[in-house]
Structures are given as structure tokens and as C-alpha cells.
């Protein structure tokens, strides 16, 4: 993985410290052209990996990249699925079963499962999960996507429900069908790491909040440091600036000295902030091994 990954929170009005700034960003990035302008700034600064949700707007970005292979020859996507609001809206509009029908192909598969009762439905959970993953991955067809994440909303929901077998299904399918590395976003890295290991998933790629002041690091600051020092996890650090509470130089320097942190993901909407973070990561972390 590259040392520095570019995230997409800023494009969809997500800011953990300022609702006003979040609203302004949501307005600014209503057009795909505005998103592409910022992505071009990042790409030209040497940040070639875009860690993004499977929002419908990202499909438009993928189309732009696919249509210009000479311009975006090194552009890499790290899809993060599923986009939670898309499914929540479908459940609201169509109900739970209707939502599943909405996203699955219309080939009678779901009707067969439902007609077969609980036993058949239980056996077919794997098949439904794989079909939903494939639907999410469609927008990245023909594009470089070597790492695929489960979004934290779903990761932590599955973790809380104790349905950790879903992680095994995801892991196997991403490796077998897409030749990619499965990865996980969570708000509680120590708990998730233990759960993944119980499913036989070792040294997973986990993206979580990691910063000097413990901002939004559920599970305990010391537990994160213990996991990183153990060598059991390949970490992607997010919220390294703690939404602006830590000076940039101090934040990156601290992260660079942690074992087990392979990458940092950050979001920015100005060329100055993009280039500033890139310079700090180059200074303290260097090029990927």
C-alpha cells in the first residue's frame, strides 16, 4: 500500500468538528467536476490512491478515470463498501425484503431462498453476500482496485451482532474473485482484530482512528498501541490530525514512529493542505517498502 491515501469524506459533507464546514463542502462538491478538480490536485501531487465509498457519485468519478487511461495511468481505487445510506434508504422505501430484491439480480434467486424456509436461507447467506459485493464492485470494472474495505458502519454492526462469519465470507470472496486484499474499517480496532483472528484471518488490513490524543479511538488508547506493537495488524491510520486538534507536523511525526502503521488516509479540499500533508509524509515516512 502507498504511504498516503486520499479519502472522500470532504466530498460528502462529513466533518467531525464543524457542521458549518461540512455543509459548505457538501454544497461545493455537488458536481463531479468539482470532485475531479481536487482529485487531480492530489494525483498531480503524487497521491495516486483514492480510498472511497461506493456512493453513486463515485461511479461518475470511476467513469472519468476509465475514460482517460493516459491521464490516470497510476490511479488506484480502494473501494469501501457498502455505502450505508444507499441501503438504509432502500429499506425505508421498500422494506427489508424489498431492499434485498432491489439490489439483487432479478433471476428468482431470492424467491427460491425465501420459499425454502430458514434452513435454505441460512445456507444461502453466503451467496447473497457475494452477490451484494459484486453489485458494489461493478463501478470499478476495468480499474485498479487491489484493496477492498468493508465500511465501519457494517463492520461494527456485524461485530456487535457477533456475526463474524460474514468477515470470512467477505475475505474469501474478495481474494478469490477479485485477486484483491480484503480490509476493514472500524471504530474499535482491538476488538475487531480479535474477532478476525478467531475467523482465521491473520495480519488483516484494518483502518481505524489512530492519533496522538486518542481522539475517537474506541477500545482504549493503550490497546491500540499493544496491537500495533504486536505485529498482528497492518494498520491504516485515519483522523491522524484529530479533526485539527493536533498540529500537522506533530501528528505525522508521531504516527511515523508507530510500528505497524503502513498508511495514512486523509481528506482535504485545498491544494495547500494536500501538498502540505504529502510533504510531511514524505519527510517522516518516506516511500513505501
Tell me what each language-model feature is.
Residues 1-26, 90-121:
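N-terminal small/glycine-rich loop or linker at the start of catalytic domains
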Residues 1-3, 62-71, 131-143, 193-197:
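Short amphipathic alpha-helices and their capping/turn segments at secondary-structure boundaries
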Residues 1-72, 254, 258:
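N-terminal binding-site loop/beta-alpha segment at the start of enzyme catalytic domains
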Residues 17-33, 113-132, 160, 241-246:
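Active-site mouth loops of central-metabolism enzymes
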Residues 27-38, 55-64, 126-137, 162-172, ...:
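Well-ordered, non-membrane alpha-helical segments in soluble/globular domains
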Residues 75-88:
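A short, structured active-site edge motif that brings together acidic residues
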Residues 85, 137, 141-146, 153-289:
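Beta/alpha (TIM)-barrel catalytic core signal, keyed to glycine-rich beta->alpha loops juxtaposed to Asp/Glu
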Residues 98-155:
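Active-site gating/metal-coordination segments in enzymes
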Amino acid at each position: 500500500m502507498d504511504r498516503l491515501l486520499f479519502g472522500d469524506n470532504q466530498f460528502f459533507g462529513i466533518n467531525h468538528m464543524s457542521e458549518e464546514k461540512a455543509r459548505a463542502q457538501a454544497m461545493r462538491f455537488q458536481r463531479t467536476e468539482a470532485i475531479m478538480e481536487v482529485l487531480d490536485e492530489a494525483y498531480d501531487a503524487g497521491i495516486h490512491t483514492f480510498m472511497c465509498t461506493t456512493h453513486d457519485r463515485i461511479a461518475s468519478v470511476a467513469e472519468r478515470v476509465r475514460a482517460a487511461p493516459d491521464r490516470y495511468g497510476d490511479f488506484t481505487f480502494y473501494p469501501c463498501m457498502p455505502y450505508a445510506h444507499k441501503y438504509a434508504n432502500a429499506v425505508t422505501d421498500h422494506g427489508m425484503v424489498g431492499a434485498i430484491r432491489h439490489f439483487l439480480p432479478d433471476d428468482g434467486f431470492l424467491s427460491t431462498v425465501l420459499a425454502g424456509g430458514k434452513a435454505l436461507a441460512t445456507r444461502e447467506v453466503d451467496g447473497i453476500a457475494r452477490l451484494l459485493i459484486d453489485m458494489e464492485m461493478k463501478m470499478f470494472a476495468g480499474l485498479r482496485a487491489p484493496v477492498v474495505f468493508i465500511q465501519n458502519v457494517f463492520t461494527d454492526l456485524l461485530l456487535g451482532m457477533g456475526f463474524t462469519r460474514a468477515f470470512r465470507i467477505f475475505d474469501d470472496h474478495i481474494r478469490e474473485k477479485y485477486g484483491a486484499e480484503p480490509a476493514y474499517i472500524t471504530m474499535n480496532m482491538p476488538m475487531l482484530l480479535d474477532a478476525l483472528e478467531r475467523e482465521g484471518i491473520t495480519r488483516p488490513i484494518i483502518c481505524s482512528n489512530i492519533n496522538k490524543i486518542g481522539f475517537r479511538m474506541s477500545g482504549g488508547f493503550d490497546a491500540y498501541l499493544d496491537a500495533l506493537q504486536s505485529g498482528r495488524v497492518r494498520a491504516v491510520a485515519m483522523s491522524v490530525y484529530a479533526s485539527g486538534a493536533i498540529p500537522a507536523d506533530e501528528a505525522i511525526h508521531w504516527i511515523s514512529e508507530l510500528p505497524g502503521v503502513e498508511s495514512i488516509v486523509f481528506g482535504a479540499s485545498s491544494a495547500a493542505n494536500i501538498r502540505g500533508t504529502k510533504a510531511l509524509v514524505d519527510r517522516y515516512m518516506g516511500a513505501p517498502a
